[in-house]
């Protein structure tokens, strides 16, 4: 919840409050005797910082794609940090393919098509 609150505060341009939420997380997780060193200032709070903090805190919880899509950073960050995928990532990857079983199950198939860029559209 602190990461969500920090992002909301940043979006409201309340960087001081957003940084405090991040610092609360870091005080909880920091090594004794070094917690103060882990704190950030409001000037360091950016969406990229929050995304990096979310990756550290939520690694393995399968939230990364949603975070990058929601913040409109998916293409930028894949191109920057994943050299193997850099040449393959395309604008249409912002949407995922709709499972074929879902497309087969709809009654009015002419109204529901596969997302652009994936087979069947």
What is each PLM-predicted segment?
Residues 1-25, 47-57:
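Extended, hydrophobic/aromatic-rich amphipathic alpha-helical segments that build helical scaffolds
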Residues 26, 37-121:
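Long, intrinsically disordered, low-complexity segments
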Residues 32-36:
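Boundary/linker segments of alpha-helical solenoid repeat arrays
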């Amino acid at each position: 919840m602190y990461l969500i609150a920090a992002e909301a505060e940043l979006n409201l341009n309340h960087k001081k409050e957003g940084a405090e939420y991040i610092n609360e997380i870091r005080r909880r997780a920091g090594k004794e005797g070094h917690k103060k060193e882990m704190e950030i200032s409001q000037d360091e709070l950016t969406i990229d910082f929050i995304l990096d903090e979310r990756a550290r805190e939520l690694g393995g919880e399968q939230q990364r794609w949603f975070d990058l899509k929601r913040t409109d950073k998916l293409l930028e960050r894949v191109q920057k940090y994943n050299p193997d995928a850099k040449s393959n990532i395309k604008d249409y990857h912002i949407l995922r393919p709709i499972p074929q079983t879902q497309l087969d199950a709809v009654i009015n198939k002419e109204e529901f098509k596969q997302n652009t860029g994936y087979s069947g559209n």
